[in-house]
Amino acid sequence: ETKEFLSATKVSDDAFQYLVKYFEKQDEPTIICMFGDHHPSIETEFYETLLGKKQSDWGLEEIQKRYATPFIIWANYDIEEAKEVSISNNYLENMLLKQAGITLPLYNQYIEKVSQDIPAMNVNGYMDMNGKWHNYGDSESKTVSSLLHNYEILQYGYYSDSDKTTMKKLFQWK
C-alpha cells in the first residue's frame, strides 16, 4: 500500500506541474487550490514505525499527524505567501476567497470567526490557539463550546437550507 501511495503521489505531482505550467502562460488571473481530503491508506505498521510506538499507545497529537494532509494555493499572479500553515480543510475555502480578493459571504464570515479561536478541527478533535489538540467535550472553554455548537448548527443549515433564509435569520452581520 505504501509503494502504491507513493506512486500515485508522483502521478499527482506530475499532473499538478502540468496544470501549473499551463496556467503560468495564461493572461486570465487564475488561482488553483490542491489538497488531499483524507490521509493516505497506508499500513498501520508504517505509522507505528514512523512514530516509534504501537497505535494503541498513540495520543491525540499522534493520531492527528496521521490525518494531516498537505495543501497548496498557487496563482499566476502575486499572492501572499505562507508556509507551514496548520488549518483544517473547512477553512481552505476562506483562505482561497481571501487570496482572490473576494468578500466573504455570510456563511464564510462565521467560519472566519470560528477559525480565530479554533485554527483546525476534524472528526477526532480540534486544535487550540497554542497548537494543542483536544478531544471534543474535554474541558472546552465556553467560547470554544459555543463556537463549535453554533458551527454545527450553521453547517447543517448551510447544506440543508437551499435558499439560505434560515441562515440569514440566525446570523445577522453588520
Regions found by a protein language model. Give the residues of each.
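Solvent-exposed soluble domains appended to multi-pass membrane proteins
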Residues: 1-174
